[in-house]
Amino acid sequence: MKTKQIFTVLTILSGLLFASMNRAADITATNSGNWSDTNIWNSGTVPGTNDDADIPLGINVTVNTNASVQFIYDSGTVTMAPNSTLTILGDQAIDKLTSLVATATGNTVVYLGNPFFARQCNYYNLVFANTNYVDPYPPYNPYQNFNNFSSSQGPTPMTVAGNMTVIGYTKMQQGSAGADIFIGGNLIIGTNCIWDSSGANLTVVSNVFIGGLLEDLNGALGSNYFGGNVTVNPSATGGWNVSDVTQWAIGGSLTNNGPIFGVGYGSISFDGTGIITGSKPITIPTITVNGTYTIGTTITLATNTPTLNGTLVFDLANTNQIILNAGTNWLYYSGILDVINSGAAPVAGNSYKLFNAPNYGGSFTSTSFPSLPSGLNWVDNLATSGSIAVTGSSTGSPIITLSRSGNLLTLSWASTTFPGYSVQAQTNSAGIRSNWSATGSGTVSPYTITINPANPPVFFRLSNP
């Protein structure tokens, strides 16, 4: 949605970590106005990277530019203007008495310190980049929880209209008592970060990128819905833990390039349209398919049969399966099965295993298989082996086509559909006669010949002895 804008801001702000430490001041706003206006500050200077900003009661300071500060306090108000950026470097962030209005279109608030003290309110774009905070009490984690039971405001419902990004060392934990979080754009969970949506609802309208760990340790409360695509990136310590919750739901595609795992009754519900794919296979307790999804990777279900209310799409060009582990007994069919083919045409004797389980039950409300050449038929073995097969023999004969590129002539035909045919040739200036001979390599389409204009005419045909 606005991911590029956020990362551009972070690139610019990275230089703030190396700012000079030779000056630090406590600067007070004496009048309401724009942050960039030196006339509203008692020092005659705008608060900077190493300064604290005192906003007294009755004062409203509007951040109308890219501002940076260590700490904001007192009982006044800070208002974000459209497309402005406020970066807060100190661990104490914003005093709980200070009001922050951060909903203007395109604005971004960045916390570089301890996210525990970040203001729990509504934002447009929100960034946690906890890069300069170290927990002084080992062996606790090197990050603090945000918006959980121990937060100064307690668990608080929040709306982030744009994107929310957590990088560095940040832990987000939604407490119960209605601490729902609604994100209108993308959610980016960086390496070394954890998002635990325990006890409340998490809604992301657009895409979710998981580089750290996404989990829900209290699946009995709340639900989690992602309207766009979910991408799980490679991670040695993170991934997507679907354990202890049956209420993960996706409206787009799932791309798994890292670990997805879970035990018990953890499940993902695929409610929209897309593809389940990635460089890594998926192993989770079970899935629900309510929408239309192409199976683009192998999915192993550890404990429970899938709930198939929507449409499953398998492509014969791939070998992906839905596997139900031994010991979990029956895999039950329902919904619609649509088998397509983007690869070579099936031939008699081919078998395609789509499902792998100890036992099979139920039935699809409808099935659709790719068309076959005349004489071939599909055999539906789904109820016994989770597979479909091709039987019969092709009738008719292939049609040879030609194309020329420079001095190369290419002959093509459906050699997979019509096996056994080969190219024969004869050279004869007087026309076609009976002296056909094998070309040797012309047994599989395509067959390419070099044209020599100095030679007599050459004729080609397909033959099946």
Where are these regions (language model features)?
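Sec-dependent, cleavable N-terminal signal peptides
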Residues: 1-25
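Generic recognition of long tandem-repeat/solenoid scaffolds
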Residues: 109, 195, 202, 217, ...
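Short, composition-biased motifs enriched in small/polar/acidic residues
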Residues: 389-465
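Extracellular, surface-exposed repeat/solenoid domains
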Residues: 159-160, 300-303, 307-391
